[in-house]
Amino acid sequence: MMPFLCSLASGSSGNALLVVSAGARVLVDLGLSQRRLKTGLKAAGTAPDEIDAVLLTHTHTDHFFTAAVGFCLEHQVPVYSAEENLRHLSRSLAGFRELGKAGLARAINGGTLQIGDLAVESFDVPHDSHGRALGFRLAFGPTRRRRTVAVATDLGHMPGECLRWFVDANAVVLESNHDAEMLRASGRPWNLIERIAGPWGHLSNEAAADALAEIVGRSHPGRVASIILAHLSKDCNTPQLALEAQAHLAHGRTHPIRFLAAAQWAVGPRIEV
């Protein structure tokens, strides 16, 4: 079986990304009910008992909440995240301490985490969650055919120290949250608009396009094969607008790039890595 990734859900109502290699199956975030999760996993050809780990980006409830605790306890799935995030969830999320008691809440303290044949590295991203917000770079396969996936779904801007983790990734999963004009005209309270558009909020389509242009420009030709636009706002964005913002990257390339806008309520296709 070819390694692949599959978005089970992406957005403010819940997030989960499945990454499958030859020797491991992991979820990046688990912000879904058990029913939605199991339905999504089945659609992606994966059983709950096959999940080896959850990589938690940050502590907001659309990325991890009470139902995830029950799933991880039932199927003995470890949750890896920053120590600060584990401490916060132990205080704020019902049942999370039970994961700690079961040895399933495990801190990422830098370096490389090995899960089966997946080598996982984490990096800090700018987002206004309690604890630390993380992105992940996952690598697998033999040295000469090494494949990589880089993920960051909630970040207010793309500093250089974050961007470097995406260079030469075969698959990039990056937030493209809102259209700036739709956000300004949304009728939301101005302080919320400022928070979303601010440097610790969420990437606009335009900011995502700028970051992706630099990522592709700094990568070896043909290395970036797939780009998944994530965490689209249901009120202040559309898949069409998010994809149109990337049009300059999609056309006229010697090595074509596949673009996909991840959906909130539909399981995405398998993207081979």
Task: State each model region's role.
Residues 1-44, 132-154, 171:
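Conserved beta-strand hairpin/beta-sheet module of binuclear metal-dependent hydrolase folds
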Residues 28-31, 51-59, 80-83, 150-153, ...:
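Active-site neighborhood of phospho(di)ester-bond hydrolases with catalytic His/Asp-centered motifs
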Residues 35-81:
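Active-site metal-binding motif and surrounding structural segment of the metallo-beta-lactamase
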Residues 45-47, 95-100, 144, 218-221, ...:
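Short helix-capping segments at alpha-helix termini
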Residues 60-64, 87-89, 130, 157-160, ...:
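Active-site environment of divalent metal-dependent phosphoester hydrolases
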Residues 65-75, 90-93, 237-244:
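Metal-dependent catalytic neighborhoods of phosphoester/phosphodiester hydrolases
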Residues 83-146:
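Metallo-beta-lactamase
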Residues 160-262:
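Cap/insert and terminal regions of metallo-dependent hydrolase folds
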